[in-house]
């Protein structure tokens, strides 16, 4: 299947690892000109919570961007009572404000150039909050889904199609790195990381966690010319963890 991405400028935030890195690789394989954004190990290195970051990312594009993938994010396995105001603000600034500023900067440029694609990487926790992750993550990921829908309604008529992908648990660095979610949950439960990972896998209808590449495949399709009639959608890529009728 030809996706029509050859030569198109595509920006991926959080592009240095996990889902973002897999998305950047897959877009490159389709012939896109990819610009990754992250704090480290990226084409554009900056803090996306800086109010000026969106303009700097747009300025770094060699020409009008075709696709923006808002993937940058973070999570911790913390109980609600442990969260401070600063913790809530950190999640809000990264998941909501950074995404909004980038969309606000990119959508007009895309519209002037004839159209484009924006994909926000939310989470199944934004559709059904998870007690495994901190409440600020679930709440801000839900806000990101709402933000996607608002921008989709505003920009579809000008050829800028905005959608979201809501992954379930993904077996990537966020989960498996030392000190990552598996270790954090193990400490909370008094178990070990392998027990946590196996429990997370077994609770999913498909019997396993997703790979970054499986999430990236959905993102890349939504970035493509083939997704020309998809706008305002929120695609669950979660192994069946969120009921279809949610």
Name the predicted role of every residue range:
Residues 1, 128, 208, 219-220, ...:
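Short C-terminal tail/terminal secondary-structure segment
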Residues 79-80, 87-92, 118, 182, ...:
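Substrate-binding pocket helix/loop in short-chain dehydrogenase/reductase
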Residues 103, 140, 148:
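Active-site helix of classical SDR
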Residues 108, 153-154, 228:
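Alpha-helical segment proximal to the catalytic Tyr-Lys
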Residues 123:
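Residue(s) in the substrate-gating loop at a strand-loop-helix junction
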Residues 156, 161, 230-232:
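Short, small/polar-rich loop/turn modules that mediate ligand/substrate recognition or access, typified
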């Amino acid at each position: 299947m030809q996706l029509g991405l050859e030569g198109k400028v595509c920006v991926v935030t959080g592009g240095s690892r996990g889902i973002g890195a897999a998305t950047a690789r897959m877009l490159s394989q389709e012939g896109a000109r990819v610009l990754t954004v992250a704090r480290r190990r990226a084409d554009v290195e900056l803090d996306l919570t800086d109010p000026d970051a969106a303009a700097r990312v747009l300025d770094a594009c060699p020409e009008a961007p075709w696709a923006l993938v808002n993937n940058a994010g973070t999570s911790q396995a913390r109980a609600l009572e442990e969260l401070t105001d600063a913790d809530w603000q950190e999640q809000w600034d990264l998941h909501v404000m950074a995404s909004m500023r980038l969309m606000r900067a990119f959508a007009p440029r895309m519209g002037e150039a004839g159209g484009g694609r924006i994909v926000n990487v939310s989470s199944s926790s934004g559709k059904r909050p998870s007690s495994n992750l901190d409440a600020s993550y679930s709440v801000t990921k839900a806000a990101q889904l709402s933000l996607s829908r608002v921008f989709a309604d505003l920009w579809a008529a000008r050829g800028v199609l905005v959608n979201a992908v809501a992954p379930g648990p993904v077996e990537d660095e966020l989960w498996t790195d030392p000190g990552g979610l598996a270790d954090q949950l193990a400490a909370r439960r008094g178990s070990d990381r392998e027990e946590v990972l196996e429990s997370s896998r077994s609770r999913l209808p498909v019997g396993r966690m997703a790979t970054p590449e499986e999430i990236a495949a959905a993102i890349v399709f939504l970035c493509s010319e083939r997704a020309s009639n998809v706008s305002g959608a929120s695609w669950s890529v979660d192994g069946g963890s969120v009921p279809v009728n949610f």
